[in-house]
């Protein structure tokens, strides 16, 4: 458990132009302008965005491993680990299902594909062939087996080779190894204390490295957004603007109404939480990857009063099991294709669609283009909706990717606070102070003597 130290002097106010969120906003605007006016040159800047995401992925595995191991090893009762995990999974299952239902309901109300009268036979199926092929690998058994790495080192380096290169760390495999190691460290008691002390000492330089890497965020966001606008162009949104607009509006309502209500019931404001995470959200927007802000999210949730052990379990797990934005997209896009191709779906078909989407969305953890691939996997199992219809949304999927990532990110932030509250592992005074824009007291490492704040006693 983290202990509050007396607050030291507040840091000097940082000029707005040196704050990360302002720099990312400027980078996104400049990248969009460059992509619009110089598309050919803008497309060549894709490596800037790719390089930044690779830098972040480089540090994700150590952050998750250190946070989880030190958190679990510091718990006095190991049954707490199972209880936290069980509560998190119950939350994920309920809200993932709710997100799927919301997408389904909105598709029926808005009817984004009605009147298009598309003949599936006239569509270019080759455009989505690669996604359909990838979707065949997404099975429940395969997903569960993939959680277990071939070796301890393999979880951090990646066991699979794609196009002659290792895939990189697998979040679920790192989580699996970290939980086992943390439990083992707790079971050996005092003999494991030197190892625990070493790992706790490593946390400070690792998170300092995260801060250093985040300074490159504006460059990564600039390159990623310039490439997107340069390659696809804003014009590609026009024909399918109704679908894109429906998805953005649905995601916004899900965050403000459903997550907002959950937040209110747990004693905090989702709008204040969004403001607190504005720099990370802008980074997600620029890179179209919620993974790019994972280390910062874990650090900020801990700073906001959530216990490190809860943060370490909920956030990485949520990145695979709590994909609210992806779930909304899957049912909304599936019904859009059905409406556009005049495909009638019975209630039974739609229930089957929900069930398959729930499973396939979990099987796409860590897969590039996960939203589109899981949609292909879902449609492949529900044959009533033509898979060829995915060609209709291929051109605008990239623009919906940002919204998926933002909604997923906010959903995991809310989940972390909620599960912490359920587990009595939330310093509510600290959370209120942070969300109101205040500077919280410094946090002492696990095991350092001190007095727990009132809201944790």
Curated annotation (Swiss-Prot):
GO biological process, one term: L-aspartate transmembrane transport
Assigned keywords, A-Z: Cell inner membrane, Cell membrane, Membrane, Symport, Transmembrane, Transmembrane helix, Transport
UniProt function note: Responsible for the transport of dicarboxylates such as succinate, fumarate, and malate from the periplasm across the membrane.
Parts of the chain that traverse the membrane: 22-42, 55-75, 90-110, 138-158, 168-188, 209-229, 242-262
Organism: Xanthomonas euvesicatoria pv. vesicatoria (strain 85-10)
InterPro entries the UniProt entry points to: C4_dicarb_transport, Na-dicarboxylate_symporter, Na-dicarboxylate_symporter_CS, Na:dicarbo_symporter_sf
Gene name in the database record: dctA
Name assigned to this protein: C4-dicarboxylate transport protein
GO cellular component terms listed in the entry, alphabetical order: plasma membrane
GO molecular function: fumarate transmembrane transporter activity; malate:proton symporter activity; succinate transmembrane transporter activity
Nucleotide-binding as UniProt keyword: no
Family: Belongs to the dicarboxylate/amino acid:cation symporter (DAACS) (TC 2.A.23) family.
Membrane topology reported for the UniProt record: Multi-pass membrane protein
PANTHER family: AEROBIC C4-DICARBOXYLATE TRANSPORT PROTEIN, PROTON/GLUTAMATE-ASPARTATE SYMPORTER
Gene3D superfamilies tied to this protein: Sodium:dicarboxylate symporter (1.10.3860.10)
Compartment(s) of residence: Cell inner membrane
Alphabetized NCBIfam families for the sequence: PRK01663.1, PRK13027.1
């Amino acid at each position: 458990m983290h202990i509050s130290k007396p607050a030291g002097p507040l840091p000097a106010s940082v000029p707005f132009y040196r704050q990360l969120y302002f720099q990312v906003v400027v980078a996104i605007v400049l990248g969009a302008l460059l992509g619009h006016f110089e598309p050919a040159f803008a497309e060549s800047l894709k490596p800037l965005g790719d390089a930044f995401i690779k830098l972040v992925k480089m540090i994700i595995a150590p952050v998750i491993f250190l946070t989880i191991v030190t958190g679990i090893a510091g718990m006095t009762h190991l049954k707490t680990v199972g209880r936290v995990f069980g509560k998190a999974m119950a939350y994920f299952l309920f809200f993932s299902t709710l997100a799927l239902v919301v997408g389904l309901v909105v598709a029926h109300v808005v009817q984004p594909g009605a009147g298009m009268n598309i003949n599936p036979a006239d569509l270019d199926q080759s455009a989505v062939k690669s996604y359909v092929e990838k979707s065949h690998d997404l099975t429940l058994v395969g997903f569960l087996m993939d959680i277990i790495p071939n070796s301890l080192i393999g979880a951090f380096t990646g066991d699979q080779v794609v196009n002659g290169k290792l895939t990189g760390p697998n979040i679920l495999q790192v989580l699996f190894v970290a939980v086992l190691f943390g439990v083992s460290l707790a079971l050996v008691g005092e003999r494991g204390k030197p190892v625990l002390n070493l790992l706790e000492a490593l946390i400070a330089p690792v998170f300092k490295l995260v801060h250093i890497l985040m300074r490159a965020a504006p460059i990564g966001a600039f390159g990623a957004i310039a490439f997107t606008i340069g390659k696809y162009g804003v014009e590609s949104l026009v024909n399918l603007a109704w679908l894109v607009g429906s998805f953005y509006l649905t995601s916004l309502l899900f965050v403000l109404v459903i997550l907002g209500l959950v937040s209110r019931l747990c004693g905090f404001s989702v709008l204040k939480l969004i403001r607190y995470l504005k720099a990370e959200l802008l980074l997600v927007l620029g890179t179209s990857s919620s993974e790019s802000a994972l280390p910062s999210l874990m650090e900020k949730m801990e700073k906001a009063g959530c216990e490190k052990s809860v943060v370490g379990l909920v956030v990485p797990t949520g990145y695979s099991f709590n994909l609210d934005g992806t779930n909304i997209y899957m049912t909304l896009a599936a019904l859009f294709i059905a409406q556009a191709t005049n495909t009638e779906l019975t209630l039974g078909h739609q229930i089957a669609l929900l069930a398959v989407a729930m499973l396939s969305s979990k099987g796409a953890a860590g897969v590039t283009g996960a939203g589109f691939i899981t949609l292909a996997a879902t449609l492949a199992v529900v044959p009533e909706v033509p898979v060829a219809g995915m060609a209709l949304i291929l051109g605008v999927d990239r623009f919906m990717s940002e919204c998926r990532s933002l909604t997923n990110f906010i959903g995991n932030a809310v989940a972390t606070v909620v599960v912490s509250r359920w587990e009595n592992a939330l310093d509510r005074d600290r959370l209120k102070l942070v969300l109101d824009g205040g500077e919280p007291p410094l946090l002492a490492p696990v095991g350092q003597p001190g007095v727990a704040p009132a809201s944790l006693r």
